[in-house]
Amino acid sequence: CDFCMINIINRTNSAAHISSADSNKFRYWDPNFIIGQFDAIAKLGIKNVKIADELFVLNPRHFEKICDLIIERGYDFNIWAYSRVDTCQPQYLDKLKRAGVNWLGLGIENPNTVLRQEIHKDSFQEVRIVDVLRQMSDAGIAVGGNYIFGLPMDTEASMKETLQFAMENLTEMSNMYSAMAYPGSPLYLAAKKGGLELPDRYSGYSQHSYWTKNLASRNLTSEQILRFRDEAWMTYHTNPKYLALLESKYGLAAMNNVKSSTTIKLKRKSLGDKPPSGGNS
């Protein structure tokens, strides 16, 4: 994706014009090696596992073998993993669930087909996101939905559509981001070429920092996007239907924990807020 820079760690050319899109090469650890790591943490009594691979559900020959090895051992893990929307096929969900994958972080990003295809320059397959969410729910897998506001072609109307989609298709967890031109990403090179304002410090690339400096779109200022993102997050997490979903699935304590987080308003320099007490953030 144009906003992602994770593959930059694989680059073999350090020239300034090289981005993560030019470095889309990686190698898999063998499943028989990976299961050894699961064996080790199982012996330690660890149950909760987060698989950091952002594209775990991508290559069936890889992730299905890992699931098979976990299932064979009868481990009772509670696993969080990640998937693209278009690779999370229904035929894999039962096996993922039996291996202990109870959560999948899903890159929904934007429900608008045109906007989503603009940032996916690879072989992204078009899918009905609503169907994917329903299939995951039917399989007993909770979803961490990830949304991005302020993509290059975003307008206020399209951002409202994204929020409306999230509100109508509630997931157990929702991350809402402003589009950020991270160094090493194609979006960063495009922003520099276009003369767009970028952060002047690394904390400016943080989504929750006082110094956050997200990217402007072709139609909206950075400030308009950031304000919308912060308000959208609050709207979602104070939605009575969402809170009822949390309470029904995870109990009153979990619901109250989320409610307490909504009492904290992020301070933003670009939106005219005074610095938070206690120093820089």
Name every feature range the model reports, one short phrase each.
Residues 186-188, 193, 197-281:
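Radical SAM enzyme core and accessory elements
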Residues 167-191:
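Internal hydrophobic scaffold segments of catalytic domains
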Residues 92-94, 152-168:
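Catalytic cores of alpha/beta
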Residues 1-144, 164:
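Radical SAM [4Fe-4S] cluster-binding motif and immediate context
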Residues 144, 172-177, 243-244:
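Acidic/polar loop patches that form or flank catalytic/metal-binding clefts of enzymes
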Residues 132-135, 164-165, 177, 228-231:
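Generic recognition of well-ordered alpha-helical segments
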Residues 84, 109-120, 133-158, 177-183, ...:
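Conserved strand-turn element in the central/C-terminal portion of the radical SAM core barrel
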Residues 63, 159, 188-189:
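Histidine/acidic-residue-rich catalytic or RNA/ligand-binding cores of hydrolases
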